[in-house]
């Protein structure tokens, strides 16, 4: 019986990708970023190993949603105290913390396990076009989340 070759975790060199979120659909952007973080785009993908890459998302404040989600999509958090439920809409959260919108969307598309939490730490989200990771020489990842639009 043949044994499936597993990639050696020490030899896996993660790459850095730069994704521009300006005028991109939130869900489709998050799905593409989650794929990069998990490493599913690689031929040596292994579900129980962290084979993913680092992803830098810029212009998080310019991400868009369709329909009435801007006013109807709700984000909830609880302080842990009685009556401590806080609810805000997509528009309110995007105005207050635009990075959080992208982070929550991507986190929901990663496995809810220890490995998923470790993969989530490889996501770096920034408001505006600037980021402090120039030393890693990130590759621009071409992304078009608008169906029918030219790239």
Swiss-Prot record:
Gene Ontology terms, MF aspect: mRNA binding; structural constituent of ribosome
Keywords for this protein: Ribonucleoprotein, Ribosomal protein
A Pfam match: Ribosomal_L13
Keyword tRNA-binding annotated: no
Highest rank taxon of the organism: Bacteria
UniProt cross-references to HAMAP family, sorted A to Z: Ribosomal_uL13 (MF_01366)
Quaternary structure note: Part of the 50S ribosomal subunit.
Homology family: Belongs to the universal ribosomal protein uL13 family.
Protein name (record): Large ribosomal subunit protein uL13
